[in-house]
Amino acid sequence: MGLXKSFALFSLLVLVLGWVQPSLSGESRESSADKFKRQHMDPDSPSKSSPTYCNQMMKRQGMTKGSCKRVNTFVHEPLEDVQAICSQGQVTCKNGRNNCYKSSSTLHITECHLKGSSKYPNCDYTTTDSQKHIIIACEGNPLVPVHFDDSV
């Protein structure tokens, strides 16, 4: 009986420490909106990216830690313009949800694709500049971008 009580108390302690520990370290979880900005926004970049742009940005923005993110898109427009898409044409997201919005005009983007022969930790990307409509998921009140769904 004492063993079961000790195990229950130990389990409770582990649960509480797991819940409290992140706040003790001073770290806070990145919000979905902040993650979107980190992973997809680069408004200050020139209109034409260098061939090594994706390799540099994917590493700088933390998308090659632990594994290589296969595909990512950077948007080279002011954040306000991208946020405004959340009030434009609503469309169905790839996952079937109804919180996606399509830009009414084309935007300057850079598409990064992991090269087939590339393996972690040496993540190597192709860099493709485009002018396309983007589709983003928005949440909150007011609505803000939280996920890059597609470019068309």
UniProtKB/Swiss-Prot annotation:
The keyword Transcription regulation is assigned to this record: no
CDD domains per UniProt: RNase_A_canonical
Any one GO MF annotation of this record: ribonuclease A activity
Any one Gene Ontology BP term: defense response to Gram-positive bacterium
Location in the cell: Secreted
Superkingdom assignment: Eukaryota
Disulfide bond annotation, renumbered to this chain: C54-C112, C68-C123, C86-C138, C93-C100
Signal peptide: 1-25
Region Disordered: start-end pairs: 25-53
One of the record's GO cellular component terms: extracellular region
Cross-referenced PANTHER family: RIBONUCLEASE, RIBONUCLEASE PANCREATIC
Family affiliation: Belongs to the pancreatic ribonuclease family.
Name of protein: Ribonuclease pancreatic beta-type
Organism, as annotated: Rattus tiomanicus
Source organism phylogeny: Eukaryota, Metazoa, Chordata, Craniata, Vertebrata
